């Protein structure tokens, strides 16, 4: 039965990764090219030109790999162990798992270290940023767990109380942001264009997780095998 969970997670990840890769190959790459073109207007040097087809192929391939990783790790292994604890059932539970995955992998870290356009220089050293990113991933995982526990503990309360209790642990993210060291960035791109770039990256990641959850829900639950349905016969 565990194999069925892994297969469904891989299929959902493959579909989500393919959609994400296509998004990157079209919208994401076009946005990046626009940012780099703007940046080149403020510099005197030129970098090597990469073929557009090659760039698109790399984007699609990278998206598929990310999708497979998240699909197998989160919706294969994770869903196998966490399914009974997830809030709701069916698509609701899968969307909750996707939200927890996004918050852990990207959402919480990006509150401290948002994605930056090409050419931006960051004040913090690379090792410091990596450690900070890993730490905020841990915070995201803890917050996600706290949200699920709050949801389950308020099962018999009113909807408003349950919703408030479930969302309350998200306030811990503000504490993490306040305690994190500042990371000033500098670059030739205007603030509005940089913000649009970041939101494009966020939209792509949200779409990746949502697509994996939707496809995983469409695949349904793994069927129990005959051996798992049978009961031991009593001795005469």
Language model regions located:
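Juxtamembrane/disordered regions of integral membrane proteins
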Residues: 1-236
């Amino acid at each position: 039965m565990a194999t069925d969970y892994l297969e469904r997670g891989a299929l959902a990840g493959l579909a989500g990764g393919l959609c994400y890769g296509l998004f990157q190959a079209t919208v994401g790459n076009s946005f990046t090219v626009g940012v780099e073109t703007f940046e080149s207007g403020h510099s005197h040097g030129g970098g090597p030109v990469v073929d557009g087809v090659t760039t698109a192929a790399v984007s699609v391939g990278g998206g598929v790999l990310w999708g497979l990783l998240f699909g197998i790790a989160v919706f294969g292994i994770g869903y196998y162990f966490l399914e009974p604890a997830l809030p709701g059932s069916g698509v609701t539970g899968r969307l909750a798992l996707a939200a927890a995955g996004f918050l852990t992998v990207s959402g919480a870290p990006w509150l401290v270290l948002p994605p930056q356009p090409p050419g931006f220089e960051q004040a913090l050293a690379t090792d410091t940023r990596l450690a900070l990113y890993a730490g905020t991933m841990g915070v995201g995982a803890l917050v996600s767990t706290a949200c699920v526990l709050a949801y389950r503990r308020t099962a018999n309360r009113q909807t408003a109380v349950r919703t408030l209790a479930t969302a309350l642990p998200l306030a811990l993210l503000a504490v993490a942001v306040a305690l994190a060291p500042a990371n000033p960035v500098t670059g030739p791109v205007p603030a509005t264009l940089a913000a649009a770039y970041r939101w494009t990256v966020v939209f792509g990641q949200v779409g990746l997780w949502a697509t994996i959850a939707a496809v995983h829900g469409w695949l349904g639950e793994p069927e129990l095998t005959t051996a798992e349905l049978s009961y031991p016969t009593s001795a005469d």
